[in-house]
Amino acid sequence: MSDNRSTYPNISTSVFSIEQEMNFTQLNIRFDPTDISILPIFNGVMDLNLDIAPNTVSKHSGNFALWLGPDERLVLVANDKILDLAQRLERELNGRHYSFIEVSSGQVIFDLKGKEVRNVISKGCSVDLHHKYFNIGQCVQTAIDKINVICFPIEENHIRIIVRTSYARALIGWFKDACLEFI
C-alpha cells in the first residue's frame, strides 16, 4: 500500500492554512448496488457505514466513507489499519461482485483550516460553501479553478480536499494567490 510520501508546501496565515494530510490510505470501493447483502458486509468489516445518502460522509473511529455514486465510495482508512482491512474484505466478500483499489498514490489529501477557509475556496469554486448549505457530514465533487476535487467539512472552519496528485502543486499555487486578500 502506498503512503504517498511526496510533500507539498504548506501555507499558513492568521486566517487560512493548508497542509497535506498523510495519515490515511484511500480506497476506492465499487460494488453492485442491486446486491442488498453486500453493504452490510462492507459495513461490518470496515466498522463504517457505507450505506449513505448521495453527497454525504460517514465517519467512525477516525475513518471516513464518502459517497461518490450509487455504486462507488471513497474510504479513508488509518494507514496502520489497511493491511488487516484488505485481508478481511477479501475473505468476507469472496464470490461477490465488487472491487476495492488503493488510490492513495494518485490522490493527495489537503486539510484547509482557518476562519476564512470557505471564503478562500469559494473564490474558485461554484458550489455554495456557506455553513447554511455545506455542513459536516456532506461532501461534494466539484472544481476549484478548473481542478477537480472532492471537498468535505471536518469542522466549521476545517475542510478536507482530495485532489489528483498531478494537479496538487497547481492547486497549492492557486491557494497561495487566493488567500492574499485575507492576510
What is the predicted role of each segment?
Residues 1-183:
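Basic, glycine/lysine-rich polyanion-binding surfaces/domains
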